[in-house]
From Swiss-Prot:
Domain of life: Archaea
Function of the molecule: Catalyzes the hydrolysis of the formamide of 2-amino-5-formylamino-6-ribosylamino-4(3H)-pyrimidinone 5'-monophosphate (FAPy) to form 2,5-diamino-6-ribosylamino-4(3H)-pyrimidinone 5'-phosphate (APy).
Pfam families xrefs: Creatininase (PF02633)
Protein's UniProt keywords contain 4Fe-4S: no
Name of the featured protein: 2-amino-5-formylamino-6-ribosylaminopyrimidin-4(3H)-one 5'-monophosphate deformylase
Reaction catalysed by this enzyme: 2-amino-5-formylamino-6-(5-phospho-D-ribosylamino)pyrimidin-4(3H)-one + H2O = 2,5-diamino-6-(1-D-ribosylamino)pyrimidin-4(3H)-one 5'-phosphate + formate + H(+)
Keyword tags: Hydrolase, Iron, Metal-binding, Zinc
GO molecular function ontology, one term from the record: ferrous iron binding
Gene that encodes it: arfB
């Protein structure tokens, strides 16, 4: 049996080796013209990997399936069961390498509907926590965050307009606006204020999110 050097490297506590970080987003979802269809997965992965590097917790990868409210039609999504099954796979394999606490960093609002099923995976020796970053879809904050991560096309901001792409701010998603008051309020804000790139805010927001998740890891170990 090999003796592993758990104290080696840039970690803040040996107990962090019992902690796993999972990214959750979406891979197939329209985000206007300036952001890619896998924006949520890339932002979640970027934050999760940086939190892993900063803390020493293990980055276990990104969940491939994603889900969504049935009335939000701006991409291709999967069932809640599909998402939970993939998370179970990561958790089961994480347990094999000594992980008993899992932090899921979710950057897709539709995935919040898995919470009830996700809670059923918890047990006395396995704890799973999901923390979400839910920004107005493809709008100012997400555009600015996408710039900070490095996935935004600044040239395409010229055509990144909800009048052209209905999913921006969900302005043109009539059914979603009718059935979800929060979505409608965000859409009205985008209609009133427009969408613009704020590079300074994007960098600040990214830094704040990473710092916040680092603190969550500290509190979980």
């Amino acid at each position: 049996m090999v003796d592993l050097r758990y104290a080696s490297g840039n970690i803040f506590d040996e107990k962090v080796h019992e902690m796993g970080i999972i990214a959750l987003g979406s891979f197939l979802e329209n985000h206007g013209s300036a952001l890619p269809i896998d924006t949520d997965a890339k932002i979640a992965s970027y934050i999760a990997l940086n939190v892993s590097i900063s803390t020493g917790a293990k980055f276990l990868g990104v969940v491939i399936p994603s889900t969504e409210y049935s009335y939000v039609k701006h991409g291709i999504h999967d069932s809640i069961e599909d998402v939970i099954t993939y998370i179970k796979y990561l958790v089961e394999n994480g347990r094999k390498i000594g992980i008993n606490k899992f932090l899921i960093i979710n950057c897709h609002g539709g995935n919040t509907i898995i919470l009830d099923e996700l809670s059923k995976l918890n047990s006395k020796d396995c704890f799973i926590k999901m923390e979400s970053v839910c920004l107005t879809h493809a709008s100012t904050e997400e555009v600015s965050l996408g710039y900070a991560v490095g996935i935004l096309s600044e040239d395409n901001m010229k055509t990144h307009d909800p009048k052209i792409y209905e999913e921006i701010g969900m302005v043109g998603l009539k059914e979603a606006r009718e059935k979800n008051e929060a979505i409608d309020l965000e859409a009205k804000s985008v209609e009133k204020n427009g969408v613009f790139l704020d590079k300074t805010h994007g960098k600040s927001l990214l830094n704040d999110l990473i710092t916040n998740y680092v603190e969550i890891v500290r509190n979980m170990i």
